[in-house]
């Protein structure tokens, strides 16, 4: 034993020296683990080889487990057989990563023995880890299977627990219920029974909850009204009675159809037998047609059976037969028989009788014999469309109201047409594309110039606008600076009524109390004040005024049109007013015509002598201040009085027609100063009635020479006297009434 121990000690010393030398050669390498030391067990077994486990790469647990098992087996064999230990394996450079940290001193033998004894315990830990993973997987699978089993098991328990009532008698249905009511409700699905009926619409339901839901949703209003049980019971009874009636009607219809079909077949057979006995080859179309007829008309009501006894039929009763839709050509072979023969169903067929009415060769239906002859026609009429008794009268849009001026009357319009027809023959007309008959005056360029004078605000382009102003165009030729005459029912508050003169000649021809509104043609040129002032101050003639007005009409857009006292010039303007707007070359011709007519007015030789009018004093009973035959106006009271209702015009123009009218509705004073050419206007209003004195010139006569006598003063007011041909109204003026 001592020898063996010495050998072991020597070996251990050698191994220590070798390890130290190896460590000196490779300082980076660590010494081998302490497991390389010889094991001093109680039996003095040879030392164990070094454990290669830490030097191997971690490839897999199985390989390490196999190596450890082999090492353990080798150690056991060495311990049993006493073989010498194997030399330690050489350490390669690849094993640097797996080197164990160096130990300063070799461990004692006790620790080595404890480590060797602990080695077998390392391998089970690895195997336990692998087994634990495997066991975890298997446990998961087992838990899943157990959970699936636990899910299926409660179902089976639920289905079996307390579900005594099973649905039997219907293959493929394994339903079971806990209550018999549920089973009965389920069986209604198989049987299709619907015992619950809606009392309002007679709809059937298999479940009571469905009926309640139907009532609450569809018949919510009815259920709210019929909360009382009595009402609901009445409704239910009514619905039941309705159902019974419907069922009875259906049954009756079906029975009637069956009876009619049977009767038709029997009668068809009788007819066929009769034809065969008499030698007629009458084949199936007749019975087949009736079978189809009744099959297609099953919805018709019950029809009375034909009487068994034969009866005669009048030929006139066959008139509704063409409505049956039967073919009309299959009875042609029977037309050779004599007419007016009676029909006997047991003796002869009906075709000879049909010859009386060749246009309606259809035979009677079999059920029409006897009392049932007129019923099919009624049924056929019910099948067609029903024609309404009353004729369809669509609603018509009301016609637009004939807008007529407020001051017009039918008499004035009719008289106006006659007057226009008479005056148009005496005028030299100029054709125009717009106004061919030249009845209406030309409309102004702007509607604002005359819109304030029309209460209804008619459009200047509408014929109503022309009708309202066309009466005075052919009756009077006023001067643009005449006085204003208005209607008593209309108050003119526009600025035009204060500046310009408007004349209405209705009162001269008829004693109408309602005078029509003035004509558009009487409206003066808007710029007449400035031209009047310039011509008055310069002392020029009336021709220059008219030429200036034409020039303004061509150049100015605001100006309306110029007005002349002669009817020929007025006619030219009416026909060519649009050309004047478009700056046509015809305006030069108009200027030449105007110059010629002004020369006629200025030259007394070219014009016919104007007859004189009786003085106003002889008409009204008053006196005049002058002894001339012209109409004079007393102006002694008007020199210093501004509020008195007179119209006083100061002018230096010696040519042109002058008319003086007296107003108390609007009194206007126009003062003409030499320094300022624009007239000053002062107006006052009063509530007295209108009294007018008017002079109208006949347009049928040639243009007269008007020689007015004018008293002009530079600082005081003066009045104009006018000589003209025509009629003078006999209404007294206000001044004459005051003077009396």
From Swiss-Prot:
Keyword Nucleus: yes
Classification via PROSITE patterns: ZINC_FINGER_C2H2_1 (PS00028), ZINC_FINGER_C2H2_2 (PS50157)
Intracellular or extracellular location(s): Nucleus
Sorted UniProt keywords: Metal-binding, Nucleus, Phosphoprotein, Repeat, Transcription, Transcription regulation, Zinc, Zinc-finger
InterPro entries associated with the record: VerF-like, Znf_C2H2_sf, Znf_C2H2_type
GO biological process, one term: regulation of transcription by RNA polymerase II
GO cellular component: chromatin; nucleus
Phenotypic effect of disruption: Produces poor biofilms and decreases infection on rat denture models. Increases phagocytosis of the fungus by host cells in presence of estrogen. Decreases expression of GPD2.
Record field: compositional bias (Polar residues): 1-18, 374-384
Subunit structure, as described in the record: Interacts with CBK1.
Other facts: Implanted medical devices, such as venous catheters, are a serious risk factor for C.albicans infection since they are substrates for the formation of biofilms, which in turn serve as reservoirs of cells to continually seed an infection.
Name the record gives this protein: Biofilm and cell wall regulator 1
Native organism: Candida albicans (strain SC5314 / ATCC MYA-2876) (Yeast)
Gene responsible for this protein: BCR1
